[in-house]
Amino acid sequence: MAARPLWKGQITFGLVNVPVSLYPAVGKTEIHFHLLDSRNMARVRYERVNEETGEEVPWNEIVKAYEYNGGDYVIVEEKELKKAAPESTQSIEIESFIPRRELDCVYFDKPYYLVPVKNGEKGYVILREVLKKTKTVGIARIVIRSKQYLAAVFPYQKGIMVNLLRFAQEFRKTDELNLPTQDIKKYKITPKELSIAEQLVNAMLTQWKPEKYHDEFRAKIMKWVEAKIKTGKTISIEKEEAAPVSTNVVDFMQLLKKSIQEKEKTKKHASGSR
């Protein structure tokens, strides 16, 4: 089955708008198991139960709360959540560009492919080629299913990839961990030991070929499952409808020049106000 886009919209940088489609770059390969009652093989159903009364709680009586100070809660209303939620928009807005070498891979979270839609090829190619030539990455904001993410935009093979980024605040500080210090003398490591370790690394050095590696656990489980399957079931998953997108032809040269002029004005204004 051909892949379907998550949404159709646009990617913007400066005043340039490029109509694109966003596709998941990673397929679902995780094995999901259902829980059954071994006595009659019926599905196990979870209920929303009140801890004190043991009674099931209807959805209209459930509220969301943030726990603080061990057992104390602040009720968060749905209208408050809606106000905090970002405006739903089918666009990727590049806010700045950074040298690609400065973006540490630990920030990468989830990849998506960007594909140009009709009349968007020229702007798409301009963005792809300028990212290659300048060896830069676009830092952008993107909203997916009502949640805003930080993302990196960079060329990948023949196309452009968007990789969601983790925020710096998500990382634990290494100070919290009992890690060895940078002073190797403290651990009495000899030059010979380092040399032998280096030889081992060089002996194991090879080219990175991702297609060589497979999820062996999944393969074993699926082989075992398929051996037991006598009948199969199919599941239909509803996909989000694609939003209409403008495909008007634009003058990219003029937009690029005007974007540069706008940035220069902003910089002059900032330096003059100091």
UniProtKB/Swiss-Prot annotation:
As one GO molecular function, the record gives: double-stranded DNA binding
Q: Which UniProt keywords apply?
A: DNA damage, DNA recombination, DNA repair, DNA-binding
The UniProt entry, under Pfam families, shows: Ku
Q: Which GO terms describe its biological process?
A: DNA recombination; double-strand break repair via nonhomologous end joining
Looking at the record, the residues that make up the Ku domain are 11-195
Matches recorded under InterPro entries: Ku70/Ku80_beta-barrel_dom, Prok_Ku, SPOC-like_C_dom_sf
UniProt cross-references to SMART domains, sorted A to Z = Ku78 (SM00559)
Keyword Nucleotide-binding assigned to the entry: answer is no
| Presence of keyword rRNA processing | no
SS bond partners: none
Q: Which family does it belong to?
A: Belongs to the prokaryotic Ku family.
Subunit structure comment from the entry: Homodimer. Interacts with LigD.
Function text: With LigD forms a non-homologous end joining (NHEJ) DNA repair enzyme, which repairs dsDNA breaks with reduced fidelity. Binds linear dsDNA with 5'- and 3'- overhangs but not closed circular dsDNA nor ssDNA. Recruits and stimulates the ligase activity of LigD.
Name of the featured protein: Non-homologous end joining protein Ku
Q: Which organism is it from?
A: Coxiella burnetii (strain RSA 331 / Henzerling II)
Gene of this entry: ku
